[in-house]
Amino acid sequence: MDKIIIEGGQTRLEGEVVIEGAKNAVLPLLAASILPSKGKTILRNVPILSDVFTMNNVVRGLDIRVDFNEAANEITVDASGHILDEAPYEYVSQMRASIVVLGPILARNGHAKVSMPGGCTIGSRPINLHLKGLEAMGATITQKGGDITAQADRLQGAMIYMDFPSVGATQNLMMAATLADGVTTIENAAREPEIVDLAQFLNKMGARIRGAGTETLTITGVTHLRGVEHDVVQDRIEAGTFMVAAAMTSGNVLIRDAVWEHNRPLISKLMEMGVSVTEEEYGIRVQANTPKLKPVTVKTLPHPGFPTDMQAQFTALMAVVNGESTMVETVFENRFQHLEEMRRMGLQSEILRETAMIHGGRQLQGAPVMSTDLRASAALILTGIVAQGVTIVNNLVHLDRGYYQFHEKLAKLGATISRSSEV
């Protein structure tokens, strides 16, 4: 099993780092590439991540041709002709995001069968919003033996209110509605930048979607879609992770290609702490004098609130800021598992239901730790950079799902970090 080894203590990160295309954008884009019955789809700026390979295999399992040119960061999908209606269990079971193929397969074929998805073990993450929305559009849904089967000769436009602005459900229903009869309205829709990117992609294909980035989406169904070319939006979570890394280490880092608007909630909290964050021609520069930073209170919320996918990394920053900071996690339950590992490094914290109190500013010590999910992996690595001594981060399977060459990028900024496959 691979591990990352960090010699921490006095590292100050400096330089530039290039941000990849967004994992959370490319996965639904690949699912949407199932929809066109004519032409090829070409996705550019695709990150080389294990989740991308998994989704490629999910789509290939539908008898769709998928070619990944890793050297060019480009994927070509040809879904013209007949496609299968059952997603392969072998790959669906590996990744939660694979549930977003349900809507496109159903809309394209009138029948779809998808196994219950896998992925990070963060809370229950129910998929009931996906299923309720499809039922509102006329689908008959059955669940048996861990499989979800959906049937609808032709989906019908519907008015859908989502009890929670779920990103995955919004994506699934938006894609399904593009080929439905009539108009579908999704109220309390997710507003994340990845939703906007998906809507722009679908509209290029010939879909008629209005309101992306707002609480109300309106989709007028069409009879067919065609393949197009599209550049994947930059990864705001990777950008945010490097912003936090700079802030934790009294660093001075230019995050190239980072989009200010996509990172506004995080930037606001960094500035509240006393971090200097400025927009430059080629990206966002973050500079900090860590000992002078102030503690803050943060509450995770759906976009445009503070992103839950930055919670673990930001608690790592709180750990090195003098005073008591508070993190309230309102999106997912059971997402403080990384704090248990950070306690092995000397962190003092208390957790009461959805709230974590971080007593920051004490010198942390290197230790062997185990990553429990994708963002926890990044948080533990950042903590290892500032901790005194050697930190070994184990179980990197999660890290590889969402960060490309993470340790190499940190090393170029000055961290003493390496990756080893030795037992």
UniProtKB/Swiss-Prot annotation:
UniProt key word Transferase: yes
EC numbers on record: 2.5.1.7
Gene Ontology CC, one term: cytoplasm
Residues annotated to bind UDP-N-acetyl-alpha-D-glucosamine: 96, 309, 331
Associated pathway: Cell wall biogenesis; peptidoglycan biosynthesis
InterPro entries xref list: Enolpyruvate_Tfrase_dom, Enolpyruvate_Tfrase_sf, MurA_subfamily, RNA3'P_cycl/enolpyr_Trfase_a/b, UDP_GlcNAc_COvinyl_MurA
Active site: 120 (proton donor)
NCBIfam families: murA, PRK09369.1
Protein name from the UniProt record: UDP-N-acetylglucosamine 1-carboxyvinyltransferase 1
Source taxonomy: Bacteria, Bacillati, Bacillota, Bacilli, Lactobacillales
Encoding gene (name): murA1
